[in-house]
Amino acid sequence: MSEEGFVLIGDSSDGHFPATSFHVYTLARKRFYCLDLGGLTESRGSSAGQKVYPTVADLPTEHSDLALIWVSKGAARRAVEAAHEAGCRRVWFSFLTTEPGAVERARELGLEIVELGRCPVAYLGREQVPTGCRIHMGSMKLTGTWQRPPQTDANVRRRELV
């Protein structure tokens, strides 16, 4: 496994292809590999037409051990299974993706939970994110969630910012 090249997991079959994240990571020149549980082979949105992997078997082996999960709560367990199958050892559940059963399954599989509920795009730096993400970052700063330690307990009562 490489130190670079995280796996970005989306699911176009339920409307959760991470087009904004895909575009932002592309603009920031981050190395990543997008796995779509819905079977897309090309990206959508502002970076349309770029390579997307429709199955774990299609992913290059040189990705890092981190998977960013950007799916509906109903597909979160399937995304965890895919991350594990891909050889990832760490998972980050983006906002509105945290489902307690998926978090429990990740732990059963020995995966480290990096974060539950915060969008990783916000941590790229202000100059690299679109206006909508900047507004989201501002709301995180206003509510104090920006500086909080990583959230890894799926059962804690909290609000996820959208």
Regions found by a protein language model. Give the residues of each.
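Short acidic, glycine/proline-enriched helix-loop-strand junctions
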Residues: T61-H63, E99-L124
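ADP-ribose/adenylate-binding Rossmann-like module
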Residues: A83-A106
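A charged, well-structured terminal subsegment
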Residues: Y123-V162
